[in-house]
Amino acid sequence: SEHAVAAARVVLASGGPALILPPQGYAPPVGKRVLVAWNGKREAARALRDAWPLIAEADEVHVLAGSPQSEAGPDGMLQRYLERHGCKANLIVDPGPDETAAEVIERNIAEYDADLLVMGLFGHSRLLVLVLGGVSRHVLSRPPIPVFVSH
């Protein structure tokens, strides 16, 4: 959608993170209940690091991993990292076998009443804008809550 492509262009052009708001606006407080979409890739790690000032002040932080292999890790490596930095996070491993990754994210936003989604924007500049795919396109085209995104 146009909203998703415009959001991707903002992130890519800025060279830094961006806060993407739902097209209809958003009035409630942002950042009290944070959901981090985690897949263990560089972009997810960058988004987590860039959003740290918000994450550190949140009342609740939920880290959503699609599988134990996504480096949130069966050994809890990411969770221990967050705790060492003063953030007690709830690790959610939710493979959603009959859902797309975007549907799993949306379901967990509702389940945990999240008011901010933190996620990495995956891909390469021009190609990303042309074929903004999968999870990024779905989430950014109609975000139900504000989305903090980094590339």
Predicted regions and their residues:
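Short linear Ser/Thr-Pro motifs
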Residues: 41, 134-136
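Intrinsically disordered or low-complexity boundary/linker segments at protein termini
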Residues: 1-60, 64-65, 142-151
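Redox- and metal-dependent alpha/beta enzyme cores, enriched for Fe-S-associated oxidoreductases
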Residues: 40-92, 96, 103
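Structural beta-alpha unit
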Residues: 84-117, 121-130, 137, 145
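A short, terminal or domain-edge coil/loop segment
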Residues: 17-25, 74-75, 80, 115-125, ...
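Glycine-centered tight-turn and secondary-structure capping sites
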Residues: 4, 132-133
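A generic structural signal for well-ordered alpha-helical segments
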Residues: 10-11, 82, 109, 140
